[in-house]
Regions:
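Domain-scale activation on soluble regions of proteins
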Residues: 1-461
Length: 461
């Protein structure tokens, strides 16, 4: 057992709910610290304002402002940490002394001057925070003003201010905190997005995505339409011909972006025959009437009814083992482990509402590895894992949504026709249709903000 610090002050006690988890017990990060200081400032402000004259504004103002300022410093340092994690785009950044620097003006200047050059999406957040951080830096640049009445040169702090209004302070800090939280969300989103590897020296994934939307369909490449699109794209994003070519290669090789040029990437292990074999067996495990009943009930209720659960239990006692055996015999004969893993990855990709198409390939690798380990234990173990997946009622919808999202429209049509689900297409594809429309809207907004580019006019919706 590891040694732990024994202390009469900083230790756990009763009641248990009053114990705070610190250190490795919860592993708080810099954002957790920032949130704590920000919350403390707001709680103190609330108490001072709610209990007029009970808590002296003249004394509470110091911990309030110190907590506010320190929260802002930590939020900015967290953003700089993430800025340095943006793959190859961050390699040219100058070093930053995260521990030694407490000058919030310097901290902000570093982020403000470098972040938009890494990714243009930072610009609007920088613009929204610049004046506010400047105000903080003008009063307390190094975090000393609200901690001590005098500075190192024995100069009295805050002589030029005299009065700070707590009501106004609360309003302004709420605004600043909201913008800092927005910065935190954007930084975390970009850190994950860049981890996918879909970017070039000067283009983010979103830029490449917009380029995909501006290109004509793949069948028209080599025509005047492609040359015109290339000229518009190079002008809008200020990129060389070589970088344009790199962006085009990313578009062609990205499952999600390839749909925008009407050239969906085939699945590695499944064609229509594999899907037919899978769903023929799936309908052997899931009663057709139950499937249709599930499709026609409240879309917000994705669970089976208690009555259905009871029927399923009785059916399993009376003969479900036989149905599982028949389904497994068919699936194991007609589908490879990799094909099953690919189908399950389509379902899992959509079930977890992943934002990026690249995550499907990550899911496929993970699920195929999991199934391989099950098979290494024994075929029965592998078969149970596959059957447990196949018995899930939402599998059909999840797979269809994923196929629709990746532009496999003909395959979706074949599956709907084969299983007499065409009348339920709107319900089955509602979510993926919304996401397809939303990604087009996102491209349009990005192009509107950053230079007035336009879509090819033939982007699949």
């Amino acid at each position: 057992m590891e040694d732990r610090l024994q202390n009469r002050i900083f230790r756990g006690d009763e009641p248990a709910w009053a114990n705070a988890c610190v250190g490795n017990n919860g592993s708080p990060g810099i954002i957790d610290y920032a949130e704590g200081f920000a919350d403390a400032a707001m709680v103190l402000l609330d108490q001072v304002l709610a209990h007029r004259f009970s808590y002296s504004t003249d004394t509470f103002i110091y911990p309030i402002c110190f907590n506010m300022r320190h929260a802002a410093e930590l939020y900015l340092k967290a953003a700089i940490q993430l800025l340095h994690s943006l793959g190859g785009r961050s390699r040219g950044l100058p070093p930053f002394d995260m521990d030694g620097s407490h000058d919030i003006g310097r901290i902000w200047a570093y982020f403000r001057d470098h972040a938009p050059s890494i990714d243009r999406r930072y610009q609007s957040v920088v613009d929204g925070l610049d004046d506010s951080i400047g105000d903080i830096a003008a009063v307390d640049p190094n975090g000393q003003v609200f901690r001590y009445p005098f500075g190192r040169e024995n100069n009295k702090h805050l002589e030029e201010i005299e009065v700070i209004n707590c009501r106004l302070l609360k309003e302004r800090f709420a605004e600043i905190r909201a913008k800092l939280s927005e910065l935190g969300r954007l930084s975390a989103e970009l850190a994950y997005e860049y981890s996918l590897g879909t970017y070039t020296a000067h283009l983010s994934r979103l830029d490449v995505f917009c380029i995909a939307g501006m290109l004509p369909p793949r069948a028209e490449w080599g025509t005047a339409a492609f040359d015109e699109a290339k000229a518009r794209i190079r002008n809008l994003f200020a990129i060389s011909s070589n970088e344009f070519s790199r962006a085009v290669c990313l578009v062609k090789g990205n499952r999600e972006m390839a749909t925008l040029i009407a050239s969906p990437i085939p699945l590695d292990h499944c064609d229509s025959e594999q899907f037919f074999a899978f769903f023929d067996a799936w309908f052997g495990l899931n009663d057709r009437e139950e499937v249709f009943g599930w499709l026609t009930k409240d879309p917000n209720d994705m669970s089976r009814s208690p009555e259905t659960e009871t029927q399923d239990l009785l059916a399993s006692i009376e003969g479900d083992a036989k149905a599982r055996a028949e389904a497994w015999a068919s699936v194991s004969k007609n589908l490879s482990l990799e094909a099953i893993g690919e189908i399950e990855a389509l379902y899992t990709f959509y079930k977890t509402s992943n934002m990026y198409g690249e995550e499907f390939d990550r899911e496929r690798v993970a699920i195929t590895g999991h199934l391989t380990r099950k098979l290494q234990v024994g075929e029965a173990n592998y078969g149970d894992s596959v059957m447990n997946f196949m018995e899930k009622l939402p599998v059909m919808q999840g797979v269809l949504d994923a196929l629709n999202f990746f532009g496999h429209n003909e395959l979706v049509r074949l599956l709907l026709d084969r299983y007499q689900l065409s009348n339920h297409a709107a319900r089955l594809l509602e979510d993926s249709n919304w996401r397809v429309e939303n990604r087009v809207a996102r491209i349009q907004e990005h192009l509107r903000v950053w230079g007035g580019g336009e879509l090819s006019g033939r982007v699949p919706v």
